[in-house]
């Protein structure tokens, strides 16, 4: 798959985010749609019990259904892992009045076995020698930042 083959787009007048058909966020533009890209990659995954990392956008046992809520720019990607009978509903949208990208994940255990599910994010911001980036963990969240922007 080419990196910039966009299957879904969400945004407002200042912010634009594009996604693959498997829910992978490919691009994020701000403060206008033609501005620079901020993400090198943004991958999410889970660990179920003692399993290896299951990347939500790329696992052989995952099936995908993607749709917009009716008459909105709210994008839903339903990811079902058939091995663990785990359904993940990923909801992505950009608020209309504020330039905020919201990513929400709901986990539904459809198996008869109790599962210990850990949610993981593996991401990297685009940078160069003059624009160093860093990150830090705060409570149950993560912030990545440079001198002129941050992603939390």
Q: What would you call each of these model-derived segments?
A:
Residues 1-152:
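Terminal accessory carbohydrate-recognition/targeting modules of carbohydrate-active enzymes
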């Amino acid at each position: 798959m080419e990196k910039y083959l966009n299957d879904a787009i969400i945004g407002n007048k200042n912010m634009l985010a594009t996604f693959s058909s498997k829910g992978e966020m490919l691009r994020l533009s701000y403060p206008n749609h033609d501005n620079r890209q901020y993400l090198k990659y943004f991958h999410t995954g889970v660990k179920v019990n003692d399993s290896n990392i299951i990347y939500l956008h790329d696992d052989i046992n995952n099936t995908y259904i993607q749709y917009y809520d009716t008459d909105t720019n709210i994008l839903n990607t339903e990811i079902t892992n058939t091995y663990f009978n785990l359904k993940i509903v990923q909801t992505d949208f950009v608020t209309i009045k504020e330039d905020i990208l919201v990513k929400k994940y709901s986990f539904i255990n459809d198996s008869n076995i109790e599962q210990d599910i850990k949610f993981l994010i593996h991401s990297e911001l685009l940078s160069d020698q003059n624009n160093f980036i860093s990150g830090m963990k705060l409570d149950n969240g993560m912030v990545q930042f440079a001198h002129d922007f941050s992603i939390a």
